[in-house]
Amino acid sequence: MFINRWLFSTNHKDIGTLYLLFGAWAGMAGTALSILIRSELGQPGSLLGDDQIYNVIVTAHAFVMIFFMVMPIMIGGFGNWLVPLMIGAPDMAFPRMNNMSFWLLPPSFLLLLVSSTVEAGAGTGWTVYPPLAGNLAHAGASVDLAIFSLHLAGVSSILGAINFITTIINMKPPAMSQYQTPLFVWSVLITAVLLLLSLPVLAAGITMLLTDRNLNTTFFDPAGGGDPILYQHLFWFFGHPEVYILILPGFGIISHIVTYYSGKKEPFGYMGMVWAMMSIGFLGFIVWAHHMFTVGMDVDTRAYFTSATMIIAIPTGVKVFSWLATLHGGDIKWTPPMLWALGFIFLFTVGGLTGIVLANSSLDIILHDTYYVVAHFHYVLSMGAVFAIMGGFVHWFPLLSGFTLHPTWAKVHFTLMFVGVNLTFFPQHFLGLAGMPRRYSDYPDAYTLWNALSSLGSFVSLTAVMVMIFMIWEAFASKREVLSVELTTTNIEWLHGCPPPYHTFEQPVYIKA
């Protein structure tokens, strides 16, 4: 029975739970890697060895956090659990494919871990640029294993994307229009479209890199008429939509939390929110070369990518101000999920502002590959995506488990995490402006103070992670059952109780048009 339920599952709730557990586990691994990075940088001099092992850790940290933590939790975990419940579907459109999407991830994770144990590991950075990723600078199988890992994770995501698109378009009640679905459902739909369009380009790029390394092709080798810049274009045509894939489901989660704990029936500007997400999704595909301002592009090309990138701030601003308008006049409950959501809105906005700075090609030429960039994307990921995940988790934990978290521990957890991530990443803006480059394991001692503070912050965040583990244990040990849930008519995922029965919506749902 155990094997049938958990290995061969076709139930969206069980598969969602598997994704959440896998993502939590990978998140621990990714956190451990980040602690190694910050320990190395806590003071000048060397702790772990040379730059190769350091860059292997940095590369693994990025891949683990992106492909095995944020995406499985947001899309696989929350997506699987909530999308069918929110649209009144009995399950996903392709339940067995859903199971395969999940089970491609553990082998993918294994390949990534193995890649760092053979030869000297893949110390390429998550971008895997040739010629550093070529077979001279990285002889041996490590980069090849990392590429295979990416292939598996990519196939998993593409299949999941097909499944979500089909489910959301086809499995609504006949009378329900697409514009009556909740914003989280919209965010997953748009994310799935982005995945479907961007991942094949990554697959093409890394497959060409694989043949360059092993079959003597020269796609990215000037000696044979290739061009390493082509790889950068292919990678970032995937890589930029990818960062929006990481944050869009978070937008959906935050919309639900802000609406719910403001006591509102609906978010402010529903249609504006939907169009904003669609605009962000579209614009995300036409700004990729802002990651490449330093490779020597024409001034008119740089002008285009600068202005196109800045345009994304407009739909993003629509979302931020709509969240604030949703709060306005509401009966605000200062619950832990609401704290995460408010933290998200503020810190994501700060990260967005540094993004506007980096969008200027003239400034980016100075700031490219410095800690300013690291600070920017960790503000939108470590305090955007992660805060959304935490907010969604503490908000929907009673739905998933049937038990309530201890609110005091949840607030302690939030406070520690808030202090930790800000202490870690705010000083990195100063390091970047002072010219400290990324991806080095050592630095001149002029940079010591801010690095020491940054590393101190990472240990505060580590403490927060441990508090979270305790908080989850405490909830399951105390078994406080959910008494009642408010606002169920406008939050239909709660209608079936906590937790909902194994099968929901077995008979078709009829809604008034």
From Swiss-Prot:
The entry marks the following residues as binding Na(+), namely E40, G45, S441
Query: What domain of life does the native source organism fall in?
Result: Eukaryota
Q: Where is this cross-link: 1'-histidyl-3'-tyrosine (His-Tyr)?
A: H240-Y244
Keywords in UniProt for this one? Calcium, Copper, Electron transport, Heme, Iron, Magnesium, Membrane, Metal-binding, Mitochondrion, Mitochondrion inner membrane, Respiratory chain, Sodium, Translocase, Transmembrane, Transmembrane helix, Transport
- Co-factor binding comment: Binds 2 heme A groups non-covalently per subunit.
- List the GO terms this entry assigns under cellular component, sorted alphabetically: mitochondrial inner membrane; respiratory chain complex IV
> Where mainly located?
mitochondrion
- Catalysed reactions, semicolon-separated: 4 Fe(II)-[cytochrome c] + O2 + 8 H(+)(in) = 4 Fe(III)-[cytochrome c] + 2 H2O + 4 H(+)(out)
Instruction: List ligand-binding residues for heme a3.
Output: H376
Q: Name one GO molecular function term.
A: heme binding
Q: Which GO terms describe its biological process?
A: aerobic respiration; oxidative phosphorylation; respiratory electron transport chain
Q: Which Pfam families match?
A: COX1 (PF00115)
Residues on the membrane's Mitochondrial matrix side span: 1-11, 87-94, 171-182, 262-269, 328-335, 401-406, 479-513
Q: What PROSITE patterns does the record tag this protein with?
A: COX1 (PS50855), COX1_CUB (PS00077)
Which compartments does it reside in?
Answer: Mitochondrion inner membrane
* Binding of O2, residues: Y244
Q: Which residues bind Mg(2+)?
A: H368, D369
Q: So, what pathway does this thing act in?
A: Energy metabolism; oxidative phosphorylation
Residue intervals passing through the bilayer = 12-40, 51-86, 95-117, 141-170, 183-212, 228-261, 270-286, 299-327, 336-357, 371-400, 407-433, 447-478
Residues the record lists as binding Cu cation? H240, H290, H291
Q: Which residues bind Fe(II)-heme a?
A: H61, H378
Which metal ions or organic cofactors does this protein require, according to UniProt?
A: heme; Cu cation
Subunit and partners: Component of the cytochrome c oxidase (complex IV, CIV), a multisubunit enzyme composed of 14 subunits. The complex is composed of a catalytic core of 3 subunits MT-CO1, MT-CO2 and MT-CO3, encoded in the mitochondrial DNA, and 11 supernumerary subunits COX4I, COX5A, COX5B, COX6A, COX6B, COX6C, COX7A, COX7B, COX7C, COX8 and NDUFA4, which are encoded in the nuclear genome.
The family note in this entry says: Belongs to the heme-copper respiratory oxidase family.
Chain's role: Component of the cytochrome c oxidase, the last enzyme in the mitochondrial electron transport chain which drives oxidative phosphorylation. The respiratory chain contains 3 multisubunit complexes succinate dehydrogenase (complex II, CII), ubiquinol-cytochrome c oxidoreductase (cytochrome b-c1 complex, complex III, CIII) and cytochrome c oxidase (complex IV, CIV), that cooperate to transfer electrons derived from NADH and succinate to molecular oxygen, creating an electrochemical gradient over the inner membrane that drives transmembrane transport and the ATP synthase.
| This protein's name | Cytochrome c oxidase subunit 1
Organism of origin: Ornithorhynchus anatinus
Q: Which gene encodes it?
A: MT-CO1
